Every structure is written in C-alpha cells, then in structure tokens.
C-alpha cells in the first residue's frame, strides 16, 4: 500500500523548493492519495510529485492492472495506466485520482501496452507541466538496441488537469549514443522519478530541464548520464562528453542543481551512493566536464 504521510509529503515538497517550512508545518495529518486498501484492488506504484505555478500539487503514479513492472507480466496483459491527483490546499486534501493515459495491454502496438515509472515537472512561469515515463512491454533487463522500452512524453497546458497524447521519443534518445565507444546502448531507463528545472539557466522560453538515465552499454555495463532540455522536454541532449561517463555501476540515478549552478548526479549502489559533479565552462551552451566519481561509503 502506498501512503503519502505528512513527513514524506513535506520532505518531497521541500526538496522541490516549493514550500516554506512554516507552510509545511500546517500539514499535520496523513492522507492516502492513491488508495490500495485490499489485496484484490488494482495497486498504485511509483509516485512522483510536482508543484504547479498556481500552487497546486500534482501527484502521479502507476495504476498497475498487470500488477508488475513494464515487461514483467509474462503472458499477462501488461496494462499499466498513469493516474494523477491534484491538491489545491498544500496537500491537506486531494481530488479523486483521474487517468492521464490508459495502457491498452497486449494485442495493440507495443508502445501503448503500458506506461509506468513517471517523473513530472511543472514550469515555474506558466501553466505547462511535463511528464516523462517508460512505455511498452519490454523489460529493462530484456532490452536491446532494436527492441527496448519506449520513452513517453506528455504535456499539460492547464496545471495538470488535462494532458496531451503520449509521444515516443526513444529513438531520438537512443540514437545519441550509437556512435560513442560504449554504444550502441542496449537498454535505457530514464528519469528515475526525478526531473529538475534549473533555477538559473534559461536559453529560450523555458528554464532548462535536467534528468538522468540508466543505460546498459554494448557490453552490458550499467552507466548513468545526465540529459538536458531547453524546450521543456520536447528534445534532449547529453550533458558533457558522452565518452566521459559520470557514473559507472550505479542504479536509479537522480540529478539536482547545486546553489552555484553546478549539476550533481547521485546514484544508488551496493553499500551507499555514487556521486559526480559537472562544472560548466559555459552554462548557456551546456559545455563543461564531469569530475571524478565518488562513493559515499
């Protein structure tokens, strides 16, 4: 069962820099945003959260008809929907969950089988919200360059109330790694629940977005890169030199912007976490280099 308790909700919002401590103190009671009360209920999994420019909180989660991760349903249907709930009072109460996109299950085109593991970010200066998720019916471990998970993107123009149809950008992202020494990559898991909007860098209409990915290279090694977008998620580029891998042997990475504008990536590993920091030579052109990978233990 997934519960958003007051302390977890507060922690998530403070990490987003969206709620002052005095406001957070007012959230005293636990509220079950995505209820899964019985074993027979369709389970919710993998929640993500963002704060819209109007102050609304937008929570998104998998609604797993197949009860499994993407690609692990075996001979089952494989259907996973994405659902959202909105709070207009800083998390004290939430609207009933509604469907952003329905998975169609096995038997349709592979991309629309299911959508899961979302990450979401809201533009600070407009009513636009961007969502990215895995898609399809191929597991991450089972991915190949020719047959892999999709990467679905969706936009909302009204602070998360309604959403565009999903678009698959997987080929554009995979192709960026085809000609590097570790490519072509065999599989990719993008976002890991976190997209960050820069507080400082704006080269066009929007402040820059950053997210991280987990890939298996041509030899099966697990690598983490950071991607960035200057058009609010429509297109993405690799931060830094693709030959200069920021994290090796990490899993489920997250990316954040330091107070001085540098970019830090943090990735889970056995016994702790791996870290690296990107120093910019030119922030607008996104040029610079990664430091040396460090272990928290």
Where is each model-derived feature located?
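Asp-box/BNR beta-propeller blade signature and adjacent active/binding-site loops
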Residues: 25-297
